[in-house]
Amino acid sequence: MKLKSLFLTLTLVMLYGCNTDLDDSTSQTTVSLKFTHHWDGVQVTNSGLNAFSYTNAFGNLLSIERLRYLISDLVLTKNNGQTIEIEDYRLIDIANDSSLAYVTTDLIETGSFSNLSFVFGFTNEKNSNGSYNDLNSESWNVPLMLGGGYHYMQMDGKFLNTDNIEQGYNYHAIRAVDNPGDNPSFPQDTFFRVNLGAVSIKEDGEINIAMNIAEWFKNPSTWNLNDYNQMLMPNSAAQIIMYENGQNAFTLVNNN
């Protein structure tokens, strides 16, 4: 009788263990990532470039002729703190539709994740001069006199200045630099990590990341294009404002 009870107990334990394994199993899937852009809710696409369609927080009427930026270290964080890297780096170009959407090459576990994050630009360790052939071919390099490495963002266009005359601007974000020349110095890091928050990964799911372009001109510092328009790369004060204003430019939308 005792042997029968022991056998029954072992059988139940094994069955419970097998069922637990099945419950804990997770499927894997590819995920589509899409990047969209807007100006305080008004969609910005390639078809809307070059027109004087946008007014920043200071009141400058402006156009956008080019917008491209670099993200790196795109990472999903599990609820237990473990991380999964989705993408090493990617150049996003609003004029190039193929850069705005892609499917992950590696399979990703389905389920809930506590955070999706990426670095805007490159960390200093990755920002190695001339190391990325694809970025070199895009003329994405920063001159050696400014520290070398790569741009974080290029946003170019025109605005109406105080004389109501069209004037160009080049809102180019790089690693903030002082003393351009043979021995430049770096007052502070100006790459930053964007934490988008919790996401749920489903079979053949889609993640949408949106940039509000207007944020680069308003929060926390109101940007007057009459004061800051060109030659911004060697201007560390301007670079630090870009760094601060960009913190709230990205959001996660319509995760499904």
Give residue spans per PLM region.
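Sec-dependent signal peptide recognition
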Residues: 2-9
